[in-house]
Regions:
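Conserved N-terminal beta1-alpha1 strand-loop-helix module at the mouth
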Residues: 1-72, 76-78, 84
């Protein structure tokens, strides 16, 4: 089975989850994502407000990252805050 480059790109989440990521790096990530035609961009919750103008891309984030050892209540609170942020 062959898959086209465009079809493959639409299966990718273009991700930047570095704790030291800058707004400029998030902007570059978004520009790359648009150019590549990926499915979504994934950023840390604190960077979600920088993704407000992404009509053509989906936005993803993480909860309990990176360990996943947070309690369910903590993850739920993170998810609610992320939803509020964008």
């Amino acid at each position: 089975m062959e898959i086209s480059r465009d079809a493959l790109a639409r299966m990718i989440d273009h991700t930047l989850l570095r704790t030291d990521a800058t707004p400029a790096q998030v902007s570059a990530l978004v520009a790359e994502a648009r150019e590549l035609g990926v499915f979504s961009v994934c950023v840390s919750p604190s960077m979600l407000p920088l993704t407000d103008d992404l009509a053509s891309l989906k936005v993803a984030t993480v909860c309990g990252f990176p360990s996943g050892n947070h309690t369910p209540a903590t993850k739920a609170a993170e998810a609610a805050e992320s939803s509020r942020l964008g």
